Amino acid sequence: MVQKRKDLRRSDAGSAVRAKLHKASTGKAFPVGKRAPLQIRSYAWETPATATTPSGPISITDGTIFMCNTIDPGTGDDQRSRHTTMLYKMSLNVVLWPGATTAQIVGPFRVNFWLVYDAAPTGVVPKLTDIFDVAYPKWGNTWQVSRSNVHRFIVKRKWKVDYQSSGVPVGKRQSSGVEYAPVNNVVECNKFFEKLRVKTEWANTSTGAIGDVKKGALYLCANTRQMPAGDSVTTSCTTMMQGSTRLYFKVLGNQ
């Protein structure tokens, strides 16, 4: 009779091992028999403040890309204590509205979004043309992952956000004798992504930027759909975005 091998992941011994690893990395114990809670890292989608200007919204043009899974080393609950992390969940809570020039255009607008996994980052954030075949740069809905890079880039999630513009700047007061039609020109986007399972291997460095990632980067790609005809063809349609993100992750492996 073949004896079944004991699965340490579901045994008391396995729980004890996980408890020891958790205490060694964080200095805190958790009850044996319970899973270690996910760590949480929060950051804002905004331009950083300087000595002369406050923080502000970021701009989404016909093609914008940001790294999402930035986690610096350390012993805090929002840091990585080892060289491998697993990102399980991510929230995205932002507000979007047309830029000042874009608000002068009358019509509907759309922002296309992608969460893209990069299996083999090169130390710099790639261009959108490295990820997608961009036959029509103005219209993100036509983009597909480049055939030559399908083994490197994987689209984890894809979605869109719509808003409108009446030709009047956002928040403009009513002028005497002029009527402005109310439109949905300030919109919210609230997303919660589960089962991402983005495994990242980090270099032995002191930061958590793209240059520190050996394997497994995650990017937020965005495209404001441009106008196909009319006066707006000469205008670079821009969407402003501001908000926050939370990463829910665990550290894995040895010190």
Curated annotation (Swiss-Prot):
Pfam families: Gemini_coat (PF00844). One of its GO terms (biological process) is viral penetration into host nucleus. The keyword Cell cycle does not apply. Keywords: Capsid protein, DNA-binding, Host nucleus, T=1 icosahedral capsid protein, Viral penetration into host nucleus, Virion, Virus entry into host cell. It is found in: Virion; Host nucleus. A motif (Bipartite nuclear localization signal) lies at residues 1-25. GO terms for molecular function: DNA binding; structural molecule activity. InterPro entries: Gemcoat_MSV (IPR000143), GV_A/BR1_coat (IPR000263), Viral_coat (IPR029053). GO terms for cellular component: host cell; host cell nucleus; T=1 icosahedral viral capsid. It comes from the Viruses. Belongs to the geminiviridae capsid protein family. Homomultimer. Interacts with the movement protein. Binds to single-stranded and double-stranded viral DNA. Encapsidates the viral genome into characteristic twinned ('geminate') particles. Binds the genomic viral ssDNA and shuttles it into and out of the cell nucleus. Plays a role in protection of the genome from degradation, virus acquisition and transmission by insect vectors, infectivity, and systemic movement. The CP of monopartite geminiviruses is absolutely essential for virus movement. This is Capsid protein. It comes from Miscanthus streak virus (isolate 91).
